[in-house]
């Protein structure tokens, strides 16, 4: 991946992006966050990694999220009941996968994931959050811990007090706790295997499945994810090129 700086992002931010220590782990094929993505996007990102260009401005919110994660993780230091940020690994159908969880309460058997996100995200359906946390719970089970509750702790970066004062259906605080449905063991197992298998098919040269309307963030006639290149691979995507041709 190549970075550009078309908007004169300050050097401190550039260095922070460049010094990101993130890794999905040695020998890991895909992480949980990749597994819940559309296989078309992941396969194209892998194939065209050297050709993908991202501007530093588009990484700023990721830095904000990492900062929030660090502060909240530090708040739990010294609490022996809390397992802090931890990367877990498992093998399934020949692939090594991993997932990095934020906190797990041993006493409550509660798995919490931190999100620094928008008001819109917490007021609309986010099935990918449910999938992500249940895959994390599956990983913990593989390591001998049963999870009984799942929770998102969301920090709303665009929250406005004036909106909260006017609207009853607007989040009343910039911190929102969301309970996530916990699936049964069989459903978790089947889902993880299904996600691994469809990504294996895509990676092994099989026909790439089309992204669904939901995965393209379709709103009316707009395909927001594709049009804004939020997937980073729209110019390499035959599905998106076909959609554009039909519109023209």
Where are these regions (language model features)?
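Short, surface-exposed linear patches
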Residues: 57-58, 133-135, 201-202
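Generic solvent-exposed, charged/amphipathic alpha-helical segments
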Residues: 69-73, 133-137, 193, 197
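Metal-dependent nuclease catalytic regions and adjoining charged, substrate-binding loops involved
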Residues: 1-8, 93, 138-248
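Short, well-structured alpha-helical interface segments that form or flank functional binding sites
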Residues: 98, 128-135, 187, 226
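Generic beta-structure capping elements
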Residues: 114-117, 155
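Metal-dependent nuclease catalytic cores that hydrolyze phosphodiester bonds in DNA/RNA
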Residues: 1-111, 118-131, 141, 163-169
């Amino acid at each position: 991946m190549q970075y550009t700086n078309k908007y004169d992002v300050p050097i401190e931010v550039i260095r922070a992006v460049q010094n990101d220590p993130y890794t999905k782990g040695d020998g890991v094929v895909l992480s949980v966050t990749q597994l819940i993505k559309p296989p078309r996007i992941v396969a194209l990102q892998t194939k065209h990694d050297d050709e993908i260009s991202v501007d530093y401005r588009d990484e700023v919110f990721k830095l904000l999220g990492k900062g929030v994660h660090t502060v909240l993780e530090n708040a739990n230091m010294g609490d022996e009941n809390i397992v802090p940020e931890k990367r877990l690994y498992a093998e399934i159908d020949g692939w090594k996968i991993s997932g990095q969880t934020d906190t797990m309460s041993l006493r409550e058997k509660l798995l919490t994931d931190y999100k620094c996100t928008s008001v819109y995200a917490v007021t609309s359906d986010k099935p990918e959050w449910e999938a992500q946390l249940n895959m994390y719970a599956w990983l913990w089970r593989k390591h001998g811990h049963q999870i009984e509750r799942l929770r998102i702790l969301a920090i709303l970066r665009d929250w406005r007090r004036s909106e909260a004062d006017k609207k009853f259906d607007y989040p009343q605080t910039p911190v929102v706790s969301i309970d996530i449905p916990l699936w049964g063991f069989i459903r978790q197992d089947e889902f993880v295997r299904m996600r691994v298998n469809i990504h294996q098919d895509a990676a092994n040269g099989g026909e790439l499945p089309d992204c669904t309307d939901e995965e393209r963030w379709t709103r009316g006639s707009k395909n927001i994810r594709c049009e804004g290149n939020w997937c980073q691979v729209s110019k390499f995507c035959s599905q998106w090129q076909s959609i554009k041709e039909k519109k023209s």
